[in-house]
């Protein structure tokens, strides 16, 4: 925090689908760039550790093991550093697999938030692999990436008045987004880890959706979309990044660039 402001960033990754260690290195590049710019909250895309487009390989035990190992390595790397990092990972829990946001800070894995609304129409069929976060009627304990932590509907106190809520992609596109309830629970920053593909006119609609939800919840909204390197199947992704905060009338939107470092960063007042 700096005079009541916190610097946040939405980040795209130069990843290789399935290769957890490669993604680990990509996150480190963006993380180090974020530290240089004094970013305190860094948000990466949905399933950023493995890639969103793994399809039936989400059933592979090796993928889940390597994903958890990559999260453990990230947690170890940022230990003691003044930054909060959000990464997306598939998390197994009681014989079900959840599409999750993993919140990591200087002390380790701070908590895990599962995606509630699974996209299962047209080009999406997430219910084939994942269970819904609505399974969690209350917060549960979990051992993950070497840490005893919590999984479920969690808001995170980042200190100095900054309260973080998390949702994932489709959660924003439904009539009653989880972020609305998170705001009612005190969240003044919402992070969205997303893998929204592209088609004609969708970019503008998505941009307005982020801005409108920020206004509706009277909070900052940090949106990180899947990298262009996810475009390995019949879906096209554009590294869509947005940060909206109506409190200071700021809206930033960037598309993919060749640097793939820190693509969107802004001070917000929580």
What are these regions (language model features)?
Residues 238-248, 252-263, 267-270:
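Low-acidity, Ser/Thr- and Arg-rich intrinsically disordered low-complexity segments
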């Amino acid at each position: 925090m700096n005079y009541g402001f916190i610097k946040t960033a939405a980040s795209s990754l130069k990843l290789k689908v399935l290769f957890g260690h490669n993604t680990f290195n990509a996150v480190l590049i963006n993380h180090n760039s974020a530290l240089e710019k004094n970013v305190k909250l860094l948000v990466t895309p949905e399933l950023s550790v493995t890639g969103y487009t793994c399809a039936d390989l989400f059933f592979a035990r090796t993928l889940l093991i390597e994903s958890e190992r990559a999260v453990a390595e990230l947690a170890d790397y940022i230990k003691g550093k003044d930054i909060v990092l959000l990464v997306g990972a598939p998390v197994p829990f009681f014989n079900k697999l959840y599409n999750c946001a993993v919140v990591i800070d200087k002390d380790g894995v701070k908590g895990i938030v599962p995606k509630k609304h699974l996209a299962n129409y047209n080009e999406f069929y997430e219910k084939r692999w994942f269970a819904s976060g609505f399974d969690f009627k209350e917060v549960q304990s979990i051992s993950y990436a070497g840490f005893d932590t919590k999984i479920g509907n969690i808001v995170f106190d980042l200190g100095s008045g900054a309260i973080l809520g998390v949702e994932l992609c489709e959660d924003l596109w439904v009539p009653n987004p989880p972020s609305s309830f998170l705001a009612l629970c005190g969240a003044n920053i919402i992070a969205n880890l997303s893998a929204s593909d592209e088609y004609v006119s969708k970019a503008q609609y998505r941009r307005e959706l982020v801005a409108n939800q920020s206004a509706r919840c009277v909070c900052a909204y940090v949106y990180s979309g899947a990298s262009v390197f996810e475009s390995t199947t019949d879906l096209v992704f554009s590294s869509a990044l947005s940060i909206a905060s109506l409190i200071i009338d700021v809206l930033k939107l960037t598309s993919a660039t060749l640097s793939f470092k820190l693509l969107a960063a802004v001070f917000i007042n929580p």
